Amino acid sequence: MCIIFFKFDPRPVSKNAYRLILAANRDEFYHRPARAADFWGSNNEVLSGLDMEEGKEGGTWLGISTRGKLAALTNYLQPRLNRNARGRGELVAQFLTSDMDSLSYLKKVSAEGHLYNGFNLIAADLSAEKGDVICYYGNRGEREPVVLAPGTYGLSNALLETPWRKLCFGKQLFLEAVERGRELPRDALVAQLLAVLSNDEAQLPDPAIEAQGREYVRPILSKYAAVCVRCPDYGTRTSTVILVDADGHVTFTERSMLGSDPTRWETTTHEFRLQS
């Protein structure tokens, strides 16, 4: 599972402010193969981690391109999965390489949403010329995607802004870190946000998670109900912070688990300027 917090301010009042601040955790089985975030060999405009699971190779959960296209995915918690459904990671990868705008792309996805297990998809076009646009679609919610107003949002494994306790708790920590970061250099803000993503305090009880996940989630509820998930074979493997400033400078920092060892981590940062 995953969790995402983001603050969207397309016209920041200060040159030192950010058009987008995003902090996200990817939770996955430790044995599932993946590549750490880097620019794609086949397309050096796109930066993301990559799923390397057999049959799902090339999918991703979060990425951004130098053209200003950004997408992020979470699974929708459901007790049973359709093993014949299409891989959800392709939804992010296809948008990052497409020429479609975010709303048009999500409208296309909404027509095919029944082919996938439950998911939530954020798609954004970041352009100083045309204005930043962020859209959302979840295939377990409304039939049409929505354009998001500027503001701060939280998304986990239910629909956007569903008030799971861990989402509300994490969103408050995120807001506090962003507020403190107004007076801090970029690296310090990134460190504050990574600390938020590392919080493993279980937010219990949470009957909403239990009701949605039923028998699938009950055995791991005490671990799952935290921003940072820590189970023996499953949990938070990657934490990502993306900052986009008023001038279109992007800072993409990823903290990723080395192998299957939750005591060993590596942090890398990529920086570039948006083309538009």
Curated annotation (Swiss-Prot):
The keyword Mitochondrion applies. Keywords: Cytoplasm, Golgi apparatus, Mitochondrion. Coiled coil: none annotated. The keyword Cytoplasm applies. Belongs to the Tango2 family. It comes from the Eukaryota. It is found in: Cytoplasm; Mitochondrion; Golgi apparatus. It comes from Bos taurus. GO terms for cellular component: cytoplasm; cytosol; Golgi apparatus; mitochondrion. InterPro entries: TANGO2. One of its GO terms (biological process) is Golgi organization. May be involved in lipid homeostasis. This is Transport and Golgi organization protein 2 homolog.
